[in-house]
Amino acid sequence: MHLMSKTFVLLTVPFLVLTGCSQPPMKPVSGTEVATESGRVIGVAGNEQVIHWQDIPFAQPPEGSLRWRAPQPYSNPEGQIQARESTICVQESGAISGTEGTSFVGSEDCLYLDIVAPSAARDQVLPVMVWIHGGGNTSGTKDTYDFSALAYDQQVVVVTINYRLGPLGWITHPSIQGEAEGLDKSSNFGQLDIIAALEWTQRNIQNFGGDHNNVTIFGESAGGHNVYALLVSPLANGLFHRAIAQSPYTTTVTPREAFNRNREFPELDRGSWELLQALELDPDTTSASALRSIDVYEIMSAYYSLEKDHLSPLSTADGIVIPAVGMEQALADPQYSKSVPVLSGSNRDEVTLWMGLNRYFVNGDPVLFGLLPPRMSVKNEEMYRYWVDLRSRAWKARGVDQAMLNLGEAGYENLYTYRFDWDEQAESWFISFPSLLGAAHGAEIAFVMGAPMFGPIGDYMYPDTSSAR
């Protein structure tokens, strides 16, 4: 089964949302230098239609004494911004995270954003779209996504951002919150990063031809969840004017659940109390300064050494970023309403991304005595479809339908929903993509971008580029 899983991942890379996409070589373009509060940045281009500005810092690196604190403003207007080799936030490497390497990759110095706009954008005032990547709030990077086609075809300025992930982005501990003041008392540092990126966008996007009074936030999976978090967060008031949540969910935990002392809540795994135990530290008495001095990869190693059979507490109803009543209830409360148009939806076959990896449902038959990858097939088509339909509808019921009903209760007037259906992928002798995956979790992203993802495999999956528009 171990071999089968690895092979299946390779065969289904087009549907693993957080896998890098190919881009043409970028070259500096004269006359595209833009001044920002973070420094001056020169645009680059792979074609004549759009300009990219890459790796712009929107906050100070959250490392050292700034680990597990609210993002701090970064100002260097006279500096020259250079594209970096990597801006990935620390995470576990692998196909799903779209990162290469062994064990863990990335740096705490990762709070950067990219901007892509039509070549003539700076002579106009165009709508702005800010993309929040998915990945369970534990993986992912802005670098995965190329919104060039969306920017050009729809004449919009697109911003893609990084934010802290996993235990670096979400933690609840008596010393961290107990010794802090103001926003530093939050448990939701990843979402504070997103808010900081939106604040930077408000102050600077007009220099790129964007309209700071016409900002749409959009995100998929955990990105959609974070869109909901922004809809209920008082800290995000006035930072956006429309919201799109793709395959979102509304799960939050209380601070007590996030700490989970002595595994008081056995249905939750990888709480902060467990993390400190894995680090061989006293979960109740270790100081915040001691925690901030630990090597970041040691923290990640301890975090991923913990079993994960249940939900991991991440987004926390801390009463600062997310109201203390929790996300789902806050969505229905008029006092948190942003009164903006909201579009939310899910995919017909959300859960095939995970069920297609489950040997209970899928065979991996050896080919040529194991010399070729296994041929994947569903064991029982009727049973497979039953569970796919049931669980995908459950995702929609809670993540979309209930959330939108709650927004209606809060007084939102312009609410829209969708369901994404697709089973027109190219067939492979090794796997029937339409029947095994169909409209899987994340399958819509290439259509939103307006171009195939995932390099050569994506070109195979989308033989006609226009099919992803």
Name these PLM-found stretches.
Residues G98-T99, A196, R203, A229-V232, ...:
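Substrate-access "cap/lid" subdomains that shape
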Residues G219-A229:
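Glycine-rich nucleophile elbow surrounding the catalytic serine of serine-hydrolase chemistry
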Residues I217, I244-Q246:
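A short, hydrophobic beta-strand element of the alpha/beta-hydrolase
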Residues H2, S22-N188, G458-R469:
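Non-catalytic accessory segments of hydrolases
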Residues L18-G20:
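C-terminal motif of bacterial Sec signal peptides marking the signal peptidase cleavage site
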Residues G209-E220:
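Alpha/beta-hydrolase fold nucleophile elbow
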